[in-house]
């Protein structure tokens, strides 16, 4: 009988996998509070470094209190999400395009990957509304310098996986970390059974 497969067998080297539109899932051993069980969507990955936003950290601050003009388009729960520890006083917005929508020529939209776009918060929400299913606004972001993320991946801090457009707008009551793992092949999907409270393990 062959030896059991290791979850790392499904994680390609960082240089082959990390790109705009991929997800970083915090590994079960990453217990630092800022990133524990976090799911990070990569917005940029190039020679200047890597930028992403945490998809599963809602705050208690309503979008209406910060950017009221975007309240209608904001996906539920219509709160600001904590994108990461860098520049918490700056806002970054992602949106999922409607199926079949053509963003070409639309002011204020920049393609990231698939149906996911970055939204210029100075743009007119009414002009963007027909094109998107919703927007998610993040306070701050997560950033890595050149080579830093690759080192963390080699240290097994992160699992690099493909994203679905719906991941960007997932609600706060959903366990996005577990959802992403459960849609992976065995044995990686088994990590989804890892208890939220490690004292129960």
From Swiss-Prot:
Coiled coil: none annotated. Gene3D superfamilies: VC0467-like (3.40.1740.10). It comes from the Bacteria. Pfam families: DUF179. InterPro entries: AlgH-like (IPR003774). Belongs to the UPF0301 (AlgH) family. HAMAP family: UPF0301. This is UPF0301 protein MAP_0045.
